[in-house]
Amino acid sequence: DVVNSQAGDTLPVSSFMPYVDGTMPAGTAAYEKRGVAVFVPQWQPDNCIQCNTCAFVCPHAAIRPFLLNEEEAAAAPAGLKLAQGKANLKDYKFALSVSVADCTGCGNCVDVCPAKEKALVMVSALDAQAEQENFDFLNTKVGYKETIVNKAQSVKNSQFAQPLFEFSGACAGCGETPYIKNITQLFGDRMMIANATGCSSIYGASFPASPYCTNSEGHGPAWANSLFEDFCEFGLGMKLGSDRIRQTIAEIMTEGLDCDKASDEIKALFKQWLENKNNPAVTREVADKLVPLMENTDCPHCKKLLTYKKFLAARSQWIIGGDGASYDIGYGGLDHVLASGENVNI
């Protein structure tokens, strides 16, 4: 990468034209592979109780649990350690793997491991290089089986979901990033984030490295940064703007129910969306079915709706700021936004 090679001043203006609106490519932090850790955790499967607490506290999403079926386990690299899944996951093989090149060596995972004999021990990063191949295989070939468990039920289940915030440039042992990472595992495919200037804006959007990424379906958090003094109002504005767009969608769909050029299938999906427009699961399902149909019809209402297709799935608005923004210069806005009763998360 030209910028990471400190040769960004050689780039022509034309290189930046796709990003004149302030956007930047998602998931680019995954390509940095800084390899800054001297020591990294190594999994001891015989001691592991498979609680996933280590992954839960990892500031950089560098240690992750994976579930493998029989075919995936058979295709795994020879050096990959596997254990039999426990309880309702006994039909799967369980693996805990570390991205050695992305780990910062903070040791948080080892500290929180509740096993009587620690299931993680710190070893030289030089001696653990082979683990990177295992992690890459699990991350790209096996993936995340978050649909076979209720990821919102427990810490353990949540960690089987793909983090949509990974490998940021936050300090080793950061206490902020685990919260963001875990929120993206629960809501990331439909999140909008209003961020206050501070650490979260540095590790969250230092061009060209973005730790916010997308899942296999291309869905991920939308992130924007504001100042200390108005971060809550900024987030409330994002929520109100999204609500107005979705109100427009509802109006177009209501009119579309009487459109002769809309098929019965499209009208049924319109009706389902209108009845469940604030239900995340239903609206995502409807959107996945509806968009391809609307792209292949002459219905004028469908053509209008395609402009707003990214807003079909119900969104989850988050507002993230530090102590200075929340308790000092931005408290007035925080107080008013909380009092508004709007459905935002701070």
Outline where the language-model segments fall.
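A short alpha/beta connector and helix-capping loop motif
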Residues: 329-346
